Amino acid sequence: FLSARWWEHLTTWGMRQRHGYTGGQPPFPKAQPMASRRDAWPPGGTPCSDLDFMRFQLLDNYGTDVGILNPLQPSGQGDRNNGFSAAMAHATNEWQLEAWLRKEPRLRGSVVVPYEDSAASAAEIRARAGDPNFAQVLMMSRTAEPAGNPRYWPIYEAAVEAGLPVAFHAFGYSGWAMTNGGWPSFYIEEVSEHATSCQNQVISLVVEGVFERLP
């Protein structure tokens, strides 16, 4: 789903996120592989690679009427190269449509956006406006600056125009240490900070006037 230009970039350089880890490893090196439960791995593949497996395990097994996809990795969100981030976000949205949403009516997608580039994010949201396959816009709770900062407002304005809520998934690629005391050694230290990162974003959205501007 990537153009040849950005596929070459990905295979040559990989993803360059702001976190201080090397070698293209996932941001949860201390956690379960792919940050997923062991029973989420289908036979012969990785999580989110087998629609039938997911359909049986999560939709049919629990009588789920609607499930919303939150594509996390690799989605390009938070990449240092804004052009690549936008290309990956667009490709991820196209992948959702072809591999999942058009094949399973109970699924809805999240509009993945390159949130550190608000103009590109707004363009991606407007490109998906009116598509009933998408239920929300997806951001992460650890952005480079607090989410209420005016630099992110074009994202929220485009979401309002499209009639889509904005969802924040815990974690992200801000480059800042995950705890007030610095970088942690264990996963339990990281995961306990997810709640506070979300709380901080809500406070920022309120005090910066986002809800007043976009009620």
Predicted features and spans:
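Helix-coil boundary/capping segments in enzymes
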Residues: F1-P215
